[in-house]
Swiss-Prot record:
Identification of the protein by name: ATP synthase subunit alpha
A Pfam family: ATP-synt_ab
Catalyzed reactions: ATP + H2O + 4 H(+)(in) = ADP + phosphate + 5 H(+)(out)
Organism in which the protein naturally occurs: Aeromonas salmonicida (strain A449)
Protein keywords: ATP synthesis, ATP-binding, Cell inner membrane, Cell membrane, CF(1), Hydrogen ion transport, Ion transport, Membrane, Nucleotide-binding, Translocase, Transport
Localization per Swiss-Prot or TrEMBL: Cell inner membrane
Enzyme class, first EC level, given as a word: translocase
NCBIfam families assigned: atpA, PRK13343.1
Protein family according to the UniProt entry: Belongs to the ATPase alpha/beta chains family.
GO molecular function: ADP binding; ATP binding; proton-transporting ATP synthase activity, rotational mechanism
Upper classification of the organism: Bacteria, Pseudomonadati, Pseudomonadota, Gammaproteobacteria, Aeromonadales
Length: 513
């Protein structure tokens, strides 16, 4: 068989048409040095700030310092086996984490990988860990409450959906306890929770997860863990990863709550990374951008309007606002709130719950100091009945603390002062609450009403706790309809006042405490 020149030309053209060569441009570099979790790379000319760099052994580093001749990157995880001269690749991707409802009930690491042994995580996609916060026009004012279930906080330092409320205090004063109680109280509220553990002992985190599971709150919670044994880079990135997971719900017209436990350890991890990268240190050896470290994180907690949600979901969700409420925790040293990181976070947040060792050690738990604790926007979100009843409580406690200071120097006090002191002591006792026992709005309202209307005046101080327990038990069994009505509407009117008065009069007549 002979082929003429035309057929040969056609065959060659067909072969050329079928020949597929794909050119692949790779951004490669060489490791120049490895030390203390930091690598310096030569040759990654197109690297971006925050880009993931692929290392040998399916590991990644994060590009943080872009210099003229080299790139400084922090290794996310172990750096065993890495040595000078190894090749690395730029991925062209910013760090992303999985997001979605499938993450609820799971314990994850900073990169969104499961560490609870329950198999792979189902996700609805991925989200960058660094996201620009919603703008001014996209926000809505805070006017709906987040019930912590702790009467001292819900009455005196109320928290609203979309607020940033700092929990601050020394070590071992109950900061995490407040956060965990708040999560437990959300299991039936529809608010999804994210708990970010930064730089904590693995045993402490395991205990928190176990308590959430025991109280049925884990199914509504995502736990993100960067324990004390993990690399500084993972501790630094964990809050941003958790925030992206919480934003998934906010941007779809739902409510979410995120707890950062704690941001002091994140700041220390960031300081360690910055010093190793040879960035110039500032006050307390922190880098110059440590304020921005926390401000860009906490500004992402917001209440967004219906237009923002509709635009984000491409019209799938209409007429619904979304919120992400943040409860950052800061640990102080010997009560020093004027240190660098505490003052930064106080100025960023919308108020603070200040816990003191003195109150904690004297048995007042939660150890909230009402004198310097404040909620700047939560008052607008407080339920009507609790707002009406709590005004007198805060005043009574403030007057009591003022009078108690003077009473130490004077033995003969007039009757009015004695009554105020007696009332203040009893209200302080009434504000105590056991851990893992959150109270409903109706239960809080009943207890506050009893204090406000003088029903504690003839109750001995050592009987206050028993009085409260017996009162709540009586109300739940004999007046269940009234309690359900208050929980549903939370109104304060003459009819409710009449019913509460009748309930307390009937209870006082039983003398069952």
């Amino acid at each position: 068989m002979q082929l003429n020149s035309t057929e040969i030309a056609e065959l060659i053209k067909q072969r050329i048409a079928q020949f597929d060569v794909k050119s692949e441009a790779r951004n490669e570099g060489t490791i120049v040095s490895v030390s203390d979790g930091i690598i310096r790379i030569h040759g990654l000319a197109d690297a971006m700030q925050g880009e993931m760099i692929e290392l040998p052994g399916n590991r990644f580093a994060l590009a943080l310092n872009l210099e003229r001749d080299s790139v400084g990157a922090v290794i996310m995880g172990s750096y065993d086996g890495l040595s000078e001269g190894m090749k690395v690749k730029g991925t062209g991707r910013i760090l992303e984490v999985p997001v979605g409802r499938g993450l609820l009930g799971r314990v994850l690491n900073t990169l969104g990988q499961p560490i609870d042994g329950k198999g792979p995580v189902e996700n609805d996609g991925f989200s960058p860990i660094e996201v620009i916060a919603p703008g001014v026009i996209e926000r809505k004012s805070v006017d709906q409450p987040v019930q912590t279930g702790l009467k001292a906080i819900d009455a005196m330092i109320p928290i609203g959906r979309g607020q940033r409320e700092l929990i601050i205090g020394d070590r071992q004063v109950g900061k995490t306890a407040i956060a965990i109680d708040t999560i437990i109280n959300q299991k039936d509220s529809g608010i999804k929770c994210v708990y970010v553990a930064i730089g904590q002992k693995a045993s402490t985190i395991a205990n928190v997860v176990r308590k959430l599971e025991e109280h049925g709150a884990l199914a509504n919670t995502i736990v993100v863990v960067a324990s004390a044994s993990e690399a500084a880079a993972l501790q630094y990135l964990a809050p941003y990863a958790g925030c992206s997971m919480g934003e998934y719900f906010r941007d779809r017209g739902e409510d979410a709550l995120i707890i950062y436990d704690d941001l002091s350890k994140q700041a220390v991890a960031y300081r360690q990374i910055s010093l190793l990268l040879r960035r110039p240190p500032g006050r307390e050896a922190y880098p110059g951008d440590v304020f921005y470290l926390h401000s860009r994180l906490l500004e992402r907690a917001a209440r967004v309007n219906a237009e923002y949600v509709e635009k984000f979901t491409n019209g799938a969700v209409k007429g619904q606002t979304g919120s992400l409420t943040a409860l950052p925790i800061i640990e102080t040293q010997a009560g020093d709130v004027s240190a660098f990181v505490p003052t930064n976070v106080i100025s960023i947040t919308d108020g603070q719950i200040f816990l003191t060792s003195q109150l904690f050690n004297s048995g007042i738990r939660p150890a909230v100091d009402p004198g310097i604790s404040v909620s700047r926007v939560g008052g607008a979100a407080q339920t009507k009945i609790v707002k009406k009843l709590s005004g007198g409580i805060r005043t009574a406690l403030a007057q009591y603390r003022e009078l108690a200071a003077f009473a130490q120097f004077s033995s003969d006090l007039d009757e009015a002062t004695r009554k105020q002191l007696d009332h203040g002591v009893k209200v302080t006792e009434l504000m105590k609450q056991k851990q893992y026992s959150p109270m409903s709005v109706a239960q809080q309202s009943l207890v506050l009403f009893a204090a406000e209307k003088g029903y504690l005046s003839d109750v001995e101080l050592n009987k206050i706790v028993d009085f409260e327990a017996a009162l709540l038990s009586y109300a739940n069994t004999q007046h269940a309809e009234l309690m359900a009505e208050i929980n549903a509407k939370a109104d304060y009117n003459d009819a409710i006042v009449g019913k509460l008065t009748a309930l307390l009069d009937d209870f006082k007549a039983t003398q069952t405490w």
